[in-house]
A protein has these predicted regions:
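Active-site-proximal N-terminal segment of extracellular/periplasmic enzymes that hydrolyze or transfer
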Residues: 5-73, 317-318
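Secreted, luminal/periplasmic, and some membrane-associated catalytic domains
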Residues: 6, 36-38, 59-62, 67, ...
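A long, amphipathic alpha-helix that forms part
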Residues: 231-232, 236, 259-301, 326-335, ...
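Active-site His/acidic residue clusters
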Residues: 245-279, 389-393, 496-497, 666-668
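Low-complexity, glycine/alanine/valine/leucine- and proline-rich hydrophobic stretches
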Residues: 448, 453-525
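N-terminal, active-site-proximal structural segment of metallo-dependent hydrolase catalytic domains
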Residues: 534-608, 613, 619-625, 668, ...
Length: 696
């Protein structure tokens, strides 16, 4: 009865949902017939390291994420980013299964000699095309927002590879548009207030930049860029994801950039960067609730980050010259002072909105080449740079030049590769070969030392890597070649330690000797959606029991009708699979009844879970049966199935039955009786005495 009341109010709430009405008003296509099928929402918090998240949780910056762990059985795991520790490499691995798809955020194409910058649409689209040829897109038939790649999504917006955001207004008439604006008036007011607040914060930062002697025009551009990314883009992405949940898309992926934006500018642990996490936390709450209330699909929500950030010092601030000028002096070539160093990604992200302000912000910041001269080219965006000398040198010459870059150029680490593919790291302590000397290079206490060493070899062997690979991070210092206080892409412990906040029953195998990485998440998503071999949609299996236990589950399924009023034995099977039980005792199952589409619910659930079962009908009706069942993966034998006693003279009460089975597990026989007692105390006592009698 309580479930029916809750279901009634849920239907009312769904009927009044703004997302549902907007979908109708704008005529957006829906996925039909998928109400009981599994769906997943992937939420990425760009640039948030596992330690920074724990700090934010401790300071109550992300109260909703805390609630998920305390009340919704979510678990927090460290997640290794891979190398380079940036978004293109992480999304290449997650979306397409390809590790180290790029050698840096900016590099030279070995085929045509062009400089590639992954924030540029043409470059991102070309790499995405290559990835799609090598691996299957994870986001097929779904949507993707605010990333580098679309992941094969049917719909994508605000991505570097697919700049587009007007699809939701396409085809809407004036009346629908007016209703849309009125219905979301509070949201617009809220966004306006946040924009004003963020402008105030950004202007304060602008003044500090001028005092520090920064360029007026460039500092002025940062003000609307940060506002657009931290507030406007976040709200647009949130709204689109909520609409997609109402439409029933099978997979929805969205990326919140605000923290990463502020962390680059002010540092990963700065108060400004952590302030953005409160807004992100609230946005996640809205998306999570929209997904859970969706009547179009049975959604699960996973939350993760792609990488962290290292607190860094700008190279030019530390050494009084740009990395381009330093390299030109080392290679004895003239340097054009008009060619400035590469900037970070902050300004360029504003163009992803495809708004006039984005094009204004971007004006003058694009570069056709980042080099001291045409002979020697340097690409250095973030703490990883590549040097392309344009001349062939012997191994001995390259080794001497690498040492000179470290000693005279004050670059913390330089990697070079010999003719046999051996990778060597040069720093102020000497020359080391990877992966054997990983501890000497990265420190014995690095949390991902083995994986970092292996991925560093892959990065340096990438066909587009330079003859010299520059790293601003070392065990002693963290530099970034652009002017930024937070950086990532290198092998540092903070920048390579992201996080994954997953439901405790997510089908993700937790490695025993390493951290999770994007490939593990990818396989978990594929299994959850039924795309992996042998998987069924929605399987959420615990694969990591620490000890051998007999896990028994009891579940009153209420004829497989949920609180949302949807009939779905398959959804019941998904719930059971969450807990990976050895034995399942089910009550209130329908078999052949018109009210539940005349299906055998026990058989459907058992078949879906690949279990054997026994069913006993407590009630025999003309239209079918109603009763209890026991399911198990182990050999199961029926011992007894019979009706229980009823109160004399109270034939109106629902008849009750019991089902006794014997289950063999690893040579031991376990006895189990499944029943559903009556509602009154007298009735329950009578039925309990019956089970304690000689017949049982």
């Amino acid at each position: 009865m309580i479930g029916r009341i809750e279901g009634f109010f849920l239907k009312i709430r769904r009927a009044l949902s703004r997302s549902e009405w907007i979908v109708r008003l704008l005529g957006l296509p829906r996925v039909k017939g998928a109400e009981s099928e599994a769906g997943i929402v992937l939420i990425q918090i760009d640039g948030l390291a596992h330690p920074q998240l724990k700090k934010a949780l401790k300071k109550h910056r992300m109260s909703f994420l805390n609630k998920l762990m305390q009340k919704e059985d979510y678990a927090l795991h460290p997640l290794y980013s891979g190398l380079p520790s940036n978004t293109p490499a992480f999304q290449g691995e997650l979306f397409y299964g390809i590790q180290t798809c790029v050698p840096a955020f900016s590099y030279q194409n070995s085929v045509n000699g062009e400089v590639i910058r992954m924030y540029e649409p043409e470059a991102a689209a070309a790499m995405q095309k290559h990835l799609a040829e090598e691996g299957e897109g994870l986001l097929q038939d779904g949507s993707s927002y605010s990333g580098i790649f679309s992941g094969g999504a049917m719909e994508s917006s605000f991505c570097a590879a697919t700049l587009n955001w007007r699809k939701n207004l396409h085809g809407a008439n004036a009346f629908s548009a007016a209703i849309f604006i009125l219905w979301n008036s509070w949201s617009f007011i809220r966004v306006a207030g946040l924009l004003i607040l963020e402008v105030g914060l950004a202007l304060g930062d602008f003044v500090r930049g001028l005092v520090a002697g920064q360029d007026l025009g460039k500092e002025l551009r940062f003000v609307p860029a940060r506002v657009a990314i931290s507030i406007l883009l976040r709200e647009l992405v949130t709204m689109n994801a909520m609409l997609d949940a109402a439409r029933g898309l099978p997979i929805i992926q969205l990326n919140f950039l605000g923290y990463d934006e502020q962390a680059h500018r002010r540092g990963p642990s700065s108060a400004f960067a952590h302030w953005t996490l409160k807004g992100i936390d609230h946005a996640i709450k809205r998306v999570w609730k929209a997904a859970k209330r969706s009547g179009a699909r049975d959604y699960e929500v996973w939350i993760y980050s792609d990488h962290g950030q290292e607190k860094s010092i700008p190279y030019e601030s530390a050494h009084g010259r740009s990395i381009e000028k330093a390299i030109s002096e080392i290679f004895d070539q003239p340097h054009d002072d008009k060619i400035s160093a590469e900037k970070g990604i902050q300004l360029q992200r504003a163009e992803w909105l495809s708004l006039p302000i984005g094009r204004w912000l971007f004006a003058g910041s694009k570069r056709t080449e980042t080099s001291p001269t045409p002979e020697t080219r340097v690409t250095a965006m973030g703490p990883v740079g590549h040097v392309y000398p344009g001349i062939v040198a012997t191994w001995e010459e390259r080794l001497l030049k690498a040492k000179e870059i470290v000693e005279k150029g004050k670059v913390p680490m330089v990697a070079i590769t010999d003719e046999n593919g051996g990778v060597y790291m040069i720093n102020d302590e000497g020359r080391f070969q990877l992966p054997v000397d990983a501890a000497a290079v990265f420190g014995i206490d690095h949390p991902h030392i083995k994986a970092v060493a292996q991925d560093m070899v892959k990065l340096c062997r990438h066909p587009d890597s330079g003859d010299y690979v520059l790293f601003g991070w070392s065990k002693k210092i963290s530099l970034s070649f652009p002017g930024e206080n937070g950086a990532h892409a290198g092998p540092g412990p903070a920048e390579t330690t992201a996080f994954a906040l997953l439901p405790g029953t997510a089908p993700v195998t937790l490695p025993t000797n390493r951290a999770l990485r994007a490939l593990d998440l990818r396989e978990g998503v594929r299994e959850f959606l039924g795309r992996a071999p042998g998987a069924f949609p929605g399987r959420r299996r615990q694969k990591n029991r620490k000890q051998k236990l007999l896990r028994v589950m009891t579940y009153n399924v209420h004829s497989c009708i949920g609180m949302d009023g949807k009939l779905s034995p398959e959804r019941i099977a998904r719930v059971i699979a969450q807990y990976d039980p050895d034995i399942v005792a089910l009550q209130e199952l329908d078999v052949g009844r018109r009210r539940t589409d005349a299906i055998d619910q026990a058989e459907v659930i058992a078949r879906t879970l690949e279990m054997d079962f026994h069913f006993h009908a407590a009630m025999q009706l003309e239209e079918g049966e109603y009763g209890n069942a026991v399911l198990s993966h182990h050999p199961i034998h029926l011992v007894r199935a019979a009706q229980l006693q009823r109160l004399p003279g109270r034939r109106i009460l629902e008849p009750r039955g019991a089902l006794w089975v014997r289950v063999e597990v690893e040579g031991l026989c376990h006895q189990l009786i499944n029943t559903h007692f009556g509602l009154s105390r007298r009735e329950r006592l009578l039925q309990c005495e019956d089970l304690l009698g000689p017949d049982w």
